[in-house]
Amino acid sequence: MATHLPTASIITIGDELLIGQTIDTNSAFIAQELNRIGIWVRRRVAVGDQAEEIRNALDQEAMKSDLILITGGLGPTADDMTKPLLCDYFGGKLVRDESVLKHIEYLFQEVYRRPGALLERNKRQADVPDVCE
């Protein structure tokens, strides 16, 4: 009897990836780790910061893979709309994860040594879709 390996698709988001401004090392690392635990990565897809492109990638990969991992499009800038888009797509809402917020505060205070520089846009990095696992 043949066994079915779980399958995954990795979607990377960001115009900077498409134009070569940033090298995508995240999806390579994720693919290696998934392979190590017995999950077959069937596709790695890069899309820009356009809502329609992200939705299309989600639609296509959801039909073919057991698991979809998304990386990128999560910075504190205005064009990073991945989290609100995912909430809309999956029917959830953004909630602030206090443990993530504490980590961000730690980074600003202890690592960057800029405690007063923590802005609301940085705090929004701790907002996560309540429907994602």
Report the location of each language-model feature.
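Glycine-rich phosphate/diphosphate-binding loop of Rossmann-like nucleotide-binding domains
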Residues: 2-45
